[in-house]
Amino acid sequence: MNVSLDTLDPDTFHTLTRRHRHQDVLDGLAAAEAAGLTPVKLNAVLMRGVNEDEAPALLAWCLERGYELRFIEQMPLDAQHGWDRSSMITAEEILDRLSASFDLTPEPSTTRGAAPAERWLVDGGPGRVGVIASVTRPFCRACDRTRLTADGQVRDCLFATGETDLRSALRSGADDAELAARWRTAMWGKKAGAGIDSPEFHQPDRPMSAIGG
């Protein structure tokens, strides 16, 4: 189970979410663990001037509870379209901050497969931490993922500007074979890269909150 938690501070949580529900998230994590929905994985995004100093505390908190933490570079998927690469906390910065408090040993690249996160053993293990460097070290070459949105659209990339409509096909009585063929076509239509570094890059109209996972 994946849960987003960018901060351990309730006030910072409110700044980020405009909701006073930090404790609800913590209670939900505990309930998930009690119900056996393991492993519990947390995703965190560090933002300059907001929570950039929380990396070591977040990792220590997760290690105490047996959660696996993954830091994700902030991507151009915000609803306000205000993403600025110069203000992004990079994977290198994240690792520098963590290395000041923990001994990090990189796991062999052969164990990564198509997973988006690079992983490190923390203080010799068994605890681990992952970093998803979607911007500075993109993993497009090995990506085998697509996403299905809540309104029935298949996206072949988070940064895709087009979608494959499965909802209309379902409502028209398409069988499993036709749906699979449409999805397969979308998968094979994946571009070689997301193109974030290209001058022609266009931020998707859908923010991350409307894409889902």
Regions found by a protein language model. Give the residues of each.
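Auxiliary Fe-S-binding modules of radical SAM enzymes
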Residues: 60-64, 71-213
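Radical SAM/AdoMet-radical enzyme domain recognition
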Residues: 1-72
